[in-house]
């Protein structure tokens, strides 16, 4: 069974050309299913049926797995069994018709515009790391990049003269995004410093040794910046969420935000409308003369 899983992961990497992050997530999810099969003494993937999978997902949910994580796991199982069926190794899909337990969808965490300005306008020390980190944060917020898109960015994808960046998103789909003036300035300051490291490839963001920055390194640097400037835990995706929320709040153009974020389904983008409504409700409660306030007596 394990060799079939290895072959599928190789297929995803070489034929489907999925990103390393996606491949790691698929392998992690399918390895959990494999461990369950081994514990249940199933001798082949053909032995796993919908009852087994329903029991497995219920147990995972009881152990704290979110509905979103379980939905991703079931999607991985469906993709795997599609491959097994095509290769003649199986004749069914145990995940067919199976849905994850429903759970409350958590709203993404964002910074408001004042906190974002506090983070980005906090002053940059004149050194390599500070200028690099500033360029990273400005670009994440300016263009709404995913972490994987940022760390995979190469020099030929940047056009600072016209203020554009081309990124390779999920499903190997490319999109061209605007780069704001603040991000352009930060990048123009950073790129000459980058050249001094004698970079080993065309990565836009490199370490002091000239090596491409990985996701974990970026996460740690942004976490440090958040603690220093805001006194809070900050992660790269929070800047992407803030980009989406602030843009939607200003433009009210859901389709445009969907395109900029690279969402295949507009339902994924619609979660930001809930954030916008929360903001409007807060403004209403604080500003409307007849708004119902906590502690106010009923008329």
UniProtKB/Swiss-Prot annotation:
Active site per UniProt: 146, 170, 237, 240, 263, 272 (o-(3'-phospho-dna)-tyrosine intermediate)
Domain Core-binding (CB) positions: 1-85
InterPro entries linked to this entry: CB (IPR044068), DNA_brk_join_enz (IPR011010), Integrase-like_cat_sf (IPR013762), Integrase_catalytic (IPR002104), Integrase_recombinase_N (IPR010998), Integrase_SAM-like_N (IPR004107), Recomb_XerC (IPR011931), Tyrosine_recombinase_XerC/XerD (IPR023009)
Keyword Transmembrane appears in the UniProt entry: no
Keyword Hydrolase: no
Summary of the function given for this chain in its UniProt record: Site-specific tyrosine recombinase, which acts by catalyzing the cutting and rejoining of the recombining DNA molecules. The XerC-XerD complex is essential to convert dimers of the bacterial chromosome into monomers to permit their segregation at cell division. It also contributes to the segregational stability of plasmids.
Protein name per Swiss-Prot or TrEMBL: Tyrosine recombinase XerC
């Amino acid at each position: 069974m394990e060799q079939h899983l290895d072959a599928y992961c190789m297929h995803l990497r070489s034929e489907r050309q999925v990103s390393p992050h996606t491949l790691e997530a698929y392998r992690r999810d399918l390895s959990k299913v494999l461990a369950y099969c081994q514990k249940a003494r199933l001798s082949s993937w053909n032995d796993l049926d919908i009852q087994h999978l329903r029991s497995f997902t219920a147990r995972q949910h009881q152990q704290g797995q979110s509905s979103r994580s379980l939905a991703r796991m079931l999607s991985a199982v469906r993709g795997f069994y599609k491959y097994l069926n095509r290769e003649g190794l199986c004749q069914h899909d145990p995940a067919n018709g199976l849905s994850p337990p429903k759970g409350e969808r958590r709203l993404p965490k964002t910074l408001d515009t004042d906190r974002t300005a506090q983070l980005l306008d906090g002053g940059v020390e004149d050194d390599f790391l500070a200028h690099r980190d500033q360029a990273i944060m400005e670009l994440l917020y300016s263009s709404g990049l995913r972490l994987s898109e940022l760390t995979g960015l190469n020099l030929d994808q940047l056009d600072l003269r016209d203020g554009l960046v081309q990124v390779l998103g999920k499903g190997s789909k490319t999109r061209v995004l605007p780069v704001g003036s603040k991000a352009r300035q930060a990048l123009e300051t950073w790129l000459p410093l980058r050249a001094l490291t004698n970079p080993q490839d065309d990565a836009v963001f490199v370490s002091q040794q000239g090596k491409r920055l990985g996701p974990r390194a970026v996460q740690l640097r942004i976490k440090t910046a958040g603690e220093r400037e805001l006194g809070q835990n900050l992660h790269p995706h929070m800047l992407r969420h803030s980009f989406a929320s602030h843009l939607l709040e200003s433009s009210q153009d859901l389709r445009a935000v969907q395109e900029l974020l690279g969402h295949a389904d507009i339902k994924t983008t619609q979660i930001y409308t809930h954030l916008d409504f929360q903001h409007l409700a807060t403004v209403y409660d604080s500003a409307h003369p007849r708004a119902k306030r906590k502690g106010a007596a009923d008329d």
